[in-house]
């Protein structure tokens, strides 16, 4: 199904997410109700779009979708999923991950501010 106000990038992301679980893109808040096997695959797709690409449009689309997810659930699973798909030695990927965390899970930044490092 084509959405009239969607960009080609959004259509691509929607298709990728909905391939895991039909209708998930438009109901992303329900991700917390899915079995972990499904919800973590969807979160991985979103993190990859938000951190691996070079084009700002899909990066921002994925960030926007991630911010729609319950923050408590997100805080529990972002570290686990990020370790599966982000190369922490790659400066680009790591910077995009930090930007994502600053927008979607700022609690991690706050925790770092209170560390002794």
Task: Give the positions of each predicted feature.
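Short acidic, glycine/Ser/Thr-rich loop/turn "cap" segments at secondary-structure junctions
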Residues: 80-85, 92-96
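Amphipathic alpha-helical scaffolding segments comprising HEAT/armadillo-like alpha-solenoid repeats
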Residues: 6-14, 37-49, 71-84, 106-116
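Structural detector for internal amphipathic alpha-helices that build alpha-solenoid repeat scaffolds
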Residues: 1-4, 22-37, 59-72, 91-104
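DNA-contacting interfaces and partner/effector-binding or oligomerization modules
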Residues: 1, 11-20
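Structural signature of alpha-solenoid helical repeat scaffolds
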Residues: 50-54, 85-89
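Short active-site-adjacent helix-start/loop capping segments
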Residues: 40, 54-58
